[in-house]
Amino acid sequence: MKKITMKDVRKQDYYYAEAIKTLQTNVNFAGKDVKAILITSCYPNEGKSDIAFSLAREIASSGKRVLLLDADLRKSSYVGRYQVQAKVSGLSQFLSGQIGVGDLMYATNFENLDMIFAGPSVPNPTALLGEGLFGTLLKKLREYYDYIFIDTPPVGSLIDAAIVAQKCDGAIFVVESEAVSYKVAKKAVDQIEKSGCRILGGVLNKVDMKKDKYYSHYKDRYHTYYEKIENRQEDRE
């Protein structure tokens, strides 16, 4: 496996670091059958890719074998965001038959963390992700990795995330504080649920910690909704 260097130049405060650790704990308690986890949002720029990278890196640092898979075949940002200097191949090239699996995966400079990049943007990402080759790839990856985090395009305007969700064990929603209405978030969650994917929870991102009253109200409302989700899942069992 080829090795690449990813530079994390983001500034993270104490609250962010602690939130990622809490998210890691919640993922660990999701169950041993939860390996492939989709991470998405309602709209672009809510911070889902930052959360995906931070969570993958945190869990990898605990000794777990982790793969971060960028399935945003429309507008990927990982190569530029993390200053990857090497020329890399990606998922779009693999799914279109241009490269084999041996040229798809990269070991990063972060211990236990491997990466699959999205590759060049393509005109038919929905069709590529919906084909059997993607499911076959995930099946093989499950045999080696403890966790596979799959970063997809936002749910709000594209169907890609729902297609990928069909092949995942769980999903995490990233919601930007004060940017997404409860109605929009609920509609996005429902769309993923219809694919048969279990909702593991949500992340309220970009919170202004000085606005305690707003944060508490917003958090409580989303917490109530996810409690309903958990209760529905328990009823099914």
Model-derived segments and spans:
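Alpha-helix N-cap/loop-to-helix initiation residues
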Residues: 16, 45-48, 157, 181-182
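P-loop/Walker-type NTP enzyme "switch/lid" segment
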Residues: 2-17, 21, 25-32, 41-46, ...
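Residues that mark the start of a beta-strand
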Residues: 36-38, 63-67
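A short, charged, Gly/Pro-tolerant segment at domain boundaries
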Residues: 38-45, 205, 236
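Short, well-ordered alpha-helices that flank and scaffold nucleotide-derived cofactor binding pockets
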Residues: 25, 57, 61, 166, ...
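Conserved catalytic-core segment of NTP-binding enzymes
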Residues: 118, 126-224
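C-terminal lobe/tail of nucleotide-utilizing enzymes
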Residues: 1-26, 33, 183-237
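Conserved sugar-transfer catalytic core signal across GT-A, GT-B, and GT-C glycosyltransferases
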Residues: 51, 55, 160-161
